[in-house]
């Protein structure tokens, strides 16, 4: 009886935790993750081969992190990547390391993995004009405040700081 009670308690706790998370529907198509995913999926084979390597090797700029952290309040992020894309393979682990450094709540990050056509089976990319990956879109009060596209102008931290603090910023493909 005691084991049954513990099992039921564990199931209820697990169910309530899962109910609060975003719907994760990513599947592997032609060897690539496609759909709404989470960081944990990238930390599993076969994606962990590149994720772990680029995460471990990245050193965040602590000076910029200390400036970035207070500006992250009220921000939500949509992160569009392709697990087939070299730039995404490098930038995604760096992005998550930066978010951990500023103690950003991952529930405010939506990871959308796209195919080579920059789409998902559920059209999660629709309305966001995703032309290159990675594309990281920052929102405040449900309005886009800026986006990082493919590679940094300065560093990822410095680019993010400009976006969330309201400084003038143009991503790598804006003139």
Model-flagged regions — what are they?
Residues 132, 137-174:
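Non-catalytic, surface beta->alpha helical segment in thiol-disulfide oxidoreductase systems
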Residues 73-76, 107, 141:
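Loop/turn elements at helix/coil->beta-strand transitions in domains of secreted/extracellular proteins
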Residues 117-131:
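Short Fe-S-cluster ligation motifs
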Residues 17-62, 66-71, 159-175:
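Non-globular targeting/processing and membrane-anchoring segments
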Residues 78-83, 106-120:
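Thiol-based oxidoreductase modules, predominantly thioredoxin-like and allied folds used
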Residues 70-101:
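Local sequence-structure signature of Cys/Sec-based thiol-disulfide redox active-site neighborhoods
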Residues 1-24:
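Bacterial Sec-dependent N-terminal signal peptides
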Residues 111, 131-132:
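Acidic/His-rich structured neighborhood in mature extracellular/periplasmic domains
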């Amino acid at each position: 009886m005691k084991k049954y009670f513990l099992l039921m308690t564990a199931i209820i706790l697990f169910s309530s935790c899962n109910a609060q998370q975003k719907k994760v529907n990513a599947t592997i198509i032609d060897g690539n993750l496609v759909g709404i995913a989470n960081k944990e999926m990238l930390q599993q084979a076969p994606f962990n081969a590149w994720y772990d390597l680029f995460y471990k090797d990245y050193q965040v700029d602590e000076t910029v992190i200390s400036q970035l952290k207070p500006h992250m309040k009220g921000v939500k992020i949509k992160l569009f990547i392709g697990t087939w894309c070299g730039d995404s393979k490098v930038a995604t682990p760096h992005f998550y390391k930066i978010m951990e450094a500023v103690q950003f709540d991952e529930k405010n990050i939506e990871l959308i993995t796209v195919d080579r056509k920059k789409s998902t089976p559920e059209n999660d990319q629709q309305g966001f004009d995703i032309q290159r990956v990675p594309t990281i879109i920052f929102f405040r009060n449900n309005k886009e405040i800026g986006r990082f596209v493919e590679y940094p102008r300065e560093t990822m931290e410095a680019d993010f700081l400009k976006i969330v603090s309201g400084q003038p910023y143009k991503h790598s493909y804006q003139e």
